[in-house]
A protein has these predicted regions:
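Peptidoglycan glycan-strand catalytic modules in the bacterial/periplasmic cell-wall system
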Residues: 42-44, 48-190
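N-terminal type II signal-anchor transmembrane helix
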Residues: 1-47, 86, 106
Length: 190
């Protein structure tokens, strides 16, 4: 049984090592994170009636951008606990998470376990044209390359703010403010 784990680990580690060696210096063309300095997630127009009530939104995508300080700490902490426990400690890519995912996938002979950090997910979400949702090695390599660049360019709080305003939360709702309004009829700060 132990032999199976060793073989599985080698079968996964060798191709990953080769891919890093081959694609690391050259690799796919990845977007430039410097352009995100002025980035604002797209928001749907909001139309109000004469009495001040919001007219129902007909847009397929709803988003309301909020500042980091408007998002309750319990929500920020909860997201980090679920999505990326070591967010405050790593430099964009969580090597322990990568090793954990490789080990679990190798020992189960499946690809169920992921290792995307919040910066990696943010890269995928803000560059949908360059990093399509379909799983591919080139997309993952770009995410791995972009995450440390995001960490160099932005403070952790800025990354979390961008992520929480960008993330899709179901029912056409993007970002935590739109989700709070859509699901609970309240602002995220409430």
């Amino acid at each position: 049984m132990k032999y199976r784990y060793i073989v599985a680990a080698v079968v996964v580690a060798v191709p990953l090592g080769l891919a890093a060696t081959v694609f690391g210096p050259v690799g796919p063309d990845c977007p430039d994170v410097a352009g995100l300095r002025d980035y604002r997630p797209p928001e749907a127009s909001r139309v109000f009636a004469l009495d001040g009530s919001l007219i129902p939104d007909l847009s397929p995508q709803r988003r309301v951008v909020v500042e980091y300080d408007e998002i309750p700490a319990v929500l920020r902490d909860g997201l980090v606990a679920v999505e990326d426990r070591r967010f405050w400690d790593h430099g964009g890519v969580d090597l322990r998470g990568v090793l954990r995912a490789v080990w679990r996938n190798a020992t189960s002979l499946s690809f169920r376990e992921g290792f995307s950090t919040i910066p990696m997910q943010l890269a995928r979400n803000v560059f949908p044209d360059q990093l399509p949702r379909t799983k591919s090695l080139s997309r993952k390599i770009c995410e791995i390359r972009l995450a440390p660049k995001l960490e160099d360019e932005f403070a952790k709080e800025d990354i979390l703010e961008l992520y929480l305003n960008q993330v899709y939360l179901g029912s056409g709702l993007y970002g935590v403010e739109a989700a709070a309004e859509g699901y609970f009829g309240k602002s995220v700060s409430e």
